[in-house]
């Protein structure tokens, strides 16, 4: 599957659907971004069931700002509408494949429970 250009207009709809979305925040002038692009594109071909989206931080400054992107490339993984990974830096192919494997293995019911407990603890501590 080819990568999809993500914009302010389609980001929420495409990345908050069921399934896994890998999102690469990048810019044309960024050397590490250009080095990571073939790794990301090849992974999209190997995993057609996953959305591989790219956000051009130069063209989509509001989107990059909304996600607090301060370093590129930054890779995010969203599973079933929940952000489960966010890290700046380019990954080598083996590390990207391991990340995809780990995202597939997540028990999303458990992730949601943990998030709910964290929010409750934070709310309880703040009171």
Feature locations, PLM:
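A short beta-strand-turn-helix
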Residues: 4-20
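Conserved small/polar residues in nucleotide/adenosyl-binding loops
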Residues: 122-127
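Short pre-active-site segment immediately N-terminal to redox-active cysteine/selenocysteine motifs
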Residues: 19, 26-29, 71
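Structural microenvironment flanking redox-active thiols in thiol-disulfide oxidoreductases
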Residues: 55-63
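Conserved redox-active cysteine motifs that mediate thiol-disulfide chemistry
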Residues: 25-38
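Non-catalytic, surface beta->alpha helical segment in thiol-disulfide oxidoreductase systems
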Residues: 79-109
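Structural micro-motif
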Residues: 61, 67-76
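Conserved helix-turn-beta segment immediately C-terminal to the redox Cys motif
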Residues: 20, 35-55
């Amino acid at each position: 599957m080819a990568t999809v250009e993500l914009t302010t207009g389609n980001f929420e709809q495409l990345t908050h659907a069921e399934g896994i979305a890998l999102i690469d925040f990048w810019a044309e002038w960024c050397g590490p971004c250009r080095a990571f692009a073939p790794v990301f594109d090849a992974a999209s071909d190997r995993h057609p069931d996953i959305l591989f989206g790219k956000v051009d931080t130069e063209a989509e400054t509001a989107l990059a700002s909304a996600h607090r992107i301060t370093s590129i490339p930054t890779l995010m993984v969203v599973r079933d509408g929940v952000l489960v990974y966010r890290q700046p830096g380019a990954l080598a192919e083996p590390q990207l494949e391991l990340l995809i494997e780990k995202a597939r293995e997540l028990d999303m019911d458990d992730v949601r429970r943990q998030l709910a407990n964290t929010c409750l603890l934070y709310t309880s501590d703040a009171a």
